[in-house]
């Protein structure tokens, strides 16, 4: 089966700079007007500009910008930023994602140092590190991911580290390199329900992602595991509940549930806007199923309030340990 990389190579170098070359020939889909509960202030505070300056100074990429996150104003104003490593070009072409698809450049061996330096300079108590998919690399970028974690530990020993990883599909043993770097939280998002994978996340496999989360717990039970789900793509309540059960069977500690927002007319269309009341209902269901931590709201994203949520996650584990002692 031809991949996005094969297609881009066949087209030549002129498409390398195109943000979404694989979506250019898709028909436009309507972009629905956001309801009141999804509207946020435009960014622009002093601390926002300071965060932006540090990111630029260290020549870093952030998923906040690349994925057009609606929470960027709030997070950057609090000097929180999610670093995106291994470049800004992804080898996948997920229908929901705003990150550029194309042929990536070589890994920058100095990136781990620069990321660690930025984390220390920002004085972060908790940092989230994510990446593009790098199917072009033999290990999917696992060693580079681990080097970033190790570098942060050295430069900012008091900072807790959360990673949001790709699935390392067909990269046997790659995830072990990342697990063994000892992040505090290992996050890998399932993103959507199995029925919608071919449409929404065609380069991935639902059960491969589920197995990845399970392998993290099997290899290092002390690490917190986390996974996220978008809603509003056409899934049913029953399907969402089944994903919750699947996550719990893999030992996932923390689930995030948020509204899918369509980046452009070429991306997957929003089926509907899930109401705040429905998100509260999902939160209650997830807690009843045994998750240590649940974040469920229209604007919930994997790294939104990650530091505060990590503290709550630790407290929840201590409380559970005390009850079962």
UniProtKB/Swiss-Prot annotation:
Biased composition annotated in UniProt, kind: Basic and acidic residues: 8-33
Gene Ontology cellular-component annotations: cytoplasm
Key words, A-Z: 4Fe-4S, Cytoplasm, Iron, Iron-sulfur, Metal-binding, S-adenosyl-L-methionine, Transferase
Main location: cytoplasm
Positions bound to [4Fe-4S] cluster 2: 90, 94, 97
Family: Belongs to the radical SAM superfamily. Lipoyl synthase family.
UniProt protein name: Lipoyl synthase
Upper lineage: Bacteria, Pseudomonadati, Pseudomonadota, Alphaproteobacteria, Caulobacterales
